[in-house]
A protein has these predicted regions:
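Conserved protein kinase catalytic core
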Residues: 14-16, 21, 63, 135, ...
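Short, solvent-exposed loop/turn segments at secondary-structure junctions
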Residues: 12, 59-60, 132
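Active-site flanking residues adjacent to catalytic metal/cofactor-binding acidic residues
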Residues: 7-9, 56, 128-129
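Residue-level marker of alpha-helix boundaries and capping positions
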Residues: 32, 65, 124-125
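Residue-level signal for short segments within beta-strands and strand-turn junctions
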Residues: 15-17, 91, 148
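Active-site neighborhood of HAD-like aspartate-dependent phosphohydrolases
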Residues: 1-51
Length: 179
C-alpha cells in the first residue's frame, strides 16, 4: 500500500480570495493562482514517493452560483501544472451535506481515493487551511497538518501539526517519514 498526501485546494494549492476574514474559491481561470512554493513542494513529495490527492468542497456548483465545467477547467489546469494523482470533489452545498458522505468534514473523499489508489491511511497526511480539512483528516485516520492563516473561525479538533505554507508542510512530512 502507498502513502499519500491529501491536499485541500483553495488556500493550500491556490490563493483563496478572502472577504471578511473568510476564504472563497476562485470563480474563473483568471483568478486561479497557484501559491508560491507549491510546485516545488509537490515535486518534493512526489520524488519521496507520495501520491498527491486533492480533496475539495466546491458547493457553489450545487448552489448554482458556479458551473461545474469551470471547476473542471480549473482542475484540468491544476493537473497540467502539478503532479496530482487524483482530484476528489464534493459539489453538495451545506443543506445537502447531511445526505452525502463526501463533503468535508466527512471523510468520504479520502476514503474513496484510498480504495481507488490502495492508500495506507495510517501512513498518510491531510493538509488543509480550515477546520473542515482537519476534522476530515481525523475521521479518515490520517495525520493532520493545518496551514494556519488565522482565519476568523475556530477549530473543532486540534491538528497534529501547524505550519505556515505547503512548502513547510512538505518539509515536515519528509522529516516525519525519516524518523
Amino acid at each position: 500500500m502507498k502513502s499519500a498526501v491529501f491536499l485541500d485546494r483553495d488556500g493550500v494549492i491556490n490563493r483563496a480570495l478572502t472577504r471578511d476574514g473568510r476564504p472563497y474559491p476562485p470563480s474563473c481561470l483568471a483568478e486561479f493562482e497557484i501559491l508560491p512554493g507549491v510546485a516545488e513542494a509537490c515535486a518534493k513529495l512526489k520524488q519521496a514517493g507520495y501520491l498527491l490527492v486533492v480533496a475539495t468542497n466546491q458547493p457553489d456548483v450545487g448552489r448554482g452560483t458556479m458551473k461545474q465545467e469551470m471547476v473542471e477547467a480549473i482542475h484540468a489546469d491544476l493537473c497540467r501544472r502539478l503532479p496530482i494523482d487524483r482530484v476528489e470533489v464534493c459539489y453538495h452545498p451545506g443543506r445537502e451535506a447531511s445526505e452525502c458522505d463526501c463533503r468535508k468534514p466527512k471523510p468520504g473523499m479520502l476514503l474513496r481515493a484510498a480504495r481507488a489508489l490502495s492508500i495506507d491511511l495510517a501512513r498518510s497526511f491531510m493538509v488543509g487551511d480550515r477546520w473542515r480539512d482537519i476534522d476530515c483528516g481525523h475521521a479518515a485516520g490520517v495525520t493532520t497538518i493545518l496551514i494556519d492563516y488565522g482565519y476568523a473561525e475556530s477549530l473543532r479538533n486540534m491538528p497534529h501539526h501547524r505550519v505556515s505554507s505547503l512548502a513547510e508542510a512538505a518539509n515536515l512530512i519528509l522529516d516525519l517519514a525519516a524518523e
